[in-house]
A protein has these predicted regions:
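Catalytic Tyr-X3-Lys loop
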Residues: 199, 207-226, 243, 267, ...
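The beta1-alpha1 cofactor-binding region of Rossmann-like NAD(H)/NADP(H)-dependent oxidoreductases
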Residues: 146, 167-180, 211, 325
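Conserved mid-core segment of classical short-chain dehydrogenase/reductases
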Residues: 76, 172, 177, 185, ...
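Residue(s) in the substrate-gating loop at a strand-loop-helix junction
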Residues: 247
Length: 357
């Protein structure tokens, strides 16, 4: 397995915060009020933005399971198995997302981002760094992933930014449209769209892939990207950015991830074509292709054995899997019109030394 975003969106009845429910910042439930940005009065229970003991310009007090020094775990990893969709809070070796050495410079000050799959893994790390750089953040995940999303909420609000959680099923086109509208309604606008949520389930042969499985993978990984982008177009202004999570598998393939690899390749082609179409509008479209990343996606993959998980990332030149905090800065670069104003239509590879030509 290579690219690790998040498991796919699923339908759940009685979602506590459906996309079409208007929960304004003024009426949010106690303890869930959006926090204020730099220069505004924030929640009194949150740390002052851009302060962190021992780390200048790093603000949130790390969770107990987050390391305070730069030390990426290496194989062998714990042999464990998670039930779908896979919760980060249940992993014995927690993915690292805090990026304690990352120094923010206000690259995204005043911007608003919508991040799918922002409850954990790469999506959580991206949401946290976006907030650290000054952006307000809305994330999308399934109701089953809400326990992880609450940690993302805590981390984003501790950075002094506003946060919106949207729960539902990204395979539903209407829900995708509602996600965009709710982000704009509650945060005022949309500057950065990150299509990151994904579903994968390894199969050792083509014959094992059912039609239902094939459609679920495509609906979650590429169809949702199309629906979200189409809905976002009326809100995106010159200087806005669209970023999608592809994968090493989308570039080199995988014998056990035929459907997943096909969607990740489609993401690359769609993004490159989108970049050409939107260039004259001043809107940039790019994608990131991570290699193996330590997230809940793999222990929740029914086709990934605990023994294989223990060796995860060992075949990369760097001999290990990445941590989400190592991947997220690429998303900051691609979102910042100060850093990447002349960058569109690229695939930014983060694959631990593996090259594709």
């Amino acid at each position: 397995m290579t690219q690790q975003d998040r498991p796919g969106a699923k339908t759940a009845e009685n979602s506590p915060t459906p996309a079409d429910q208007d929960v304004s910042p003024q009426t949010a439930p106690p303890g869930h009020e959006p926090s204020r940005g730099a220069g505004e009065q924030g929640r009194p229970d949150l740390p002052t933005p851009n302060t962190y003991p021992g780390e200048q310009q790093h603000l949130v007090e790390a969770s107990p399971d987050q390391p305070q020094t730069k030390a990426e775990p290496k194989p062998p990893y714990p042999k464990e198995k998670l039930e779908e969709p896979g919760l980060e809070k249940e992993m014995s070796l927690k993915p690292q997302y805090m990026a304690p050495r990352y120094k923010a410079t206000g690259k995204l000050e005043g911007k608003t981002a919508l991040v799918t799959g922002g409850d954990s893994g790469i999506g959580r790390a991206v949401a946290v760094l976006y907030a650290r750089e000054g952006a307000d953040v809305a994330i999308v995940c399934t109701p089953a992933e809400q326990p992880d999303a609450e940690e993302t909420r805590r981390a984003v609000e501790a950075e002094g930014r506003r946060f919106v959680m949207i729960l539902g099923d990204l395979t539903d086109p209407k829900f995708c449209r509602d996600c965009v509208e709710r982000c704009v309604r509650e945060l005022g606008k949309l500057d950065i769209l990150v299509s990151n949520a994904a579903y994968q389930n390894r199969k050792q042969s083509l014959e094992e892939i059912t039609e239902e499985e094939w459609r679920r993978t495509f609906a979650t990984n590429i169809d949702a990207y199309f629906y979200l982008t189409k809905a976002a177009m009326k809100h995106l202004q010159p200087g806005s950015a669209i970023i999608a999570t592809s994968s090493e598998v989308g570039l080199v393939g995988s014998s056990s991830l035929l459907d997943y690899g096909a969607t990740k390749g489609a993401i690359i082609a769609f993004t490159k074509s989108l970049a050409q179409q939107l260039a004259d509008k001043g809107i940039r479209a790019n994608c990131v292709a991570p290699g193996p990343v330590w997230t809940p996606l793999n222990p929740a993959d029914r086709g990934m054995s605990p023994e294989k998980l223990a060796e995860f990332g060992q075949k990369q030149p760097m001999k290990r899997a990445a941590q989400p905090e190592e991947i997220a800065p690429a998303y900051v670069f691609l979102a910042s019109d100060a850093d990447s104003s002349y960058v569109t239509g690229i695939v930014l590879e983060e694959m631990g030394g593996l090259t594709t030509g």
